[in-house]
């Protein structure tokens, strides 16, 4: 993990922690608090083109198939791209009610692109894909 900018690293970790706390609470509004207005999200079969589209999609999910779920995220690295941009890579998964662990086939690798705007770190883009493990 890049630790040469401890204040920025702490702020980015805070963005990700807040994001997952909102997930665990099933709160779509809080989920997108740290997303840029023009943020994009790409996941298998999904392409969201704004913070509002992300919020709507999560609200629908939290009201149905994601209800009561929790998310885990194991942050791997943060790499800075100049003063106001960073890429974070993590391994994440969704734990559904009654599960104690996320099954390996539901784990994903996630890429977070963050931009510092007006002194605050915001999610500019998010992408995940299945974490395929060699047999």
Segments and roles (model prediction):
Residues 19, 26-27:
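Short helix-adjacent coil turns
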Residues 6-15, 28-84, 90-91, 103-106:
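A solvent-exposed, acidic/Ser-Thr-rich amphipathic alpha-helical stretch
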Residues 49, 94-95, 129:
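Short, surface-exposed beta-strand-loop junctions and turns on beta-sheet-rich folds
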Residues 81, 97-99, 116-120:
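Flexible loop/coil segments at beta-strand boundaries within sensory signal-transduction domains
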Residues 89-97:
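Generic short beta-strand segments
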Residues 1-10, 134-135:
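Basic/polar N-terminal segments that are highly enriched at the extreme N-terminus
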Residues 98-101, 133-135:
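A short, polar/proline- and glycine-enriched secondary-structure boundary/capping micro-motif
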Residues 107-134:
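Short beta-strand edge/turn micro-motifs at domain boundaries
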